[in-house]
Amino acid sequence: APAYAAGQAGRSPIAEQALRSRQGTYTSIINPDFIMAPQALTRKGFWMSARQDEEFRGMDIGDVDGDGRNEIVTITFTDIMIYRKEGKTLKKIHTIPGKSYVQLLSVDVADINGNGIPEIIISAVSQGIAGSFALEHKNGKYERIVSDVRMFLRVLRASGAPMLIGQQMGTIEPFQSPIYRMVWDGKKYRQDSRIRAPLGLSVFDFILDKLDPSGPEVVVAIDDLDYLRVYEKTERSIEKIHTVMGSKELLWKSDDQYGGTTNYFDLPSGMKYSNVTNEKIEKPAVNIRLTSYDVDKDGRKDLILVKNISSTGRVFKS
């Protein structure tokens, strides 16, 4: 058991490791193929593209066409756009247009089916219903290999090989359902074992990792109010963990807010979403990606996350 009190306000050893700086990051680092630096804008060799006209809602990187070079895959509200860094410029090499009624929420790049070509995995909703899908490069074009998955999908990669996780949309609240590992069965993604993460978290909220190499794997999450929380692996519900008296599952909660996003989606008529303070929210958020990496090569994982400062606040309360 940890040597610190569960849920205490002071810093635990895990928290000290996770948050060496309370100033957040200057840039969103999507996965280990991007710049690795605690302060990326001051790092020698840092590169920034020209301002893009599109409003990107998600981004990941990988060799999605099998040519040995990484592509940057982005999504807008409806479209998938693929870029490549060529010299000092960012060149758009492919656009996959979507439909106006299908809202794209997140994108991941990972070889889940094990054929050597990473899939482009999209979480999406259509008229308030989850309808995710995956694309793969075949015969010179991007083809759907999986369609209409009635789950939110996300890739976790912190502790080793990429792992696809999925979560069915709840009937009363969108994220009140268990999260499962998804595996490839030869034709589609299939639900496998349950992930031990607090019930009520969404697939967009958390990572699993050993922040301390000698410690256990923990759940690191950003809650609805943008506070960082560290949990033991558990299947207990958020409501039972977040009690006035505290709980052993909640190892630590930050004093400062991190994250921050304008990526929201509409719910079906009659459905509402309750945040950690039980306020009813009309539009749940898709959190900006958390990741972990040993930035300074000291054998311990560092958390890499965004701290956005916005004047809009949380404006979607009912």
Where are these regions (language model features)?
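Beta-propeller-forming repeat regions
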Residues: 1-318
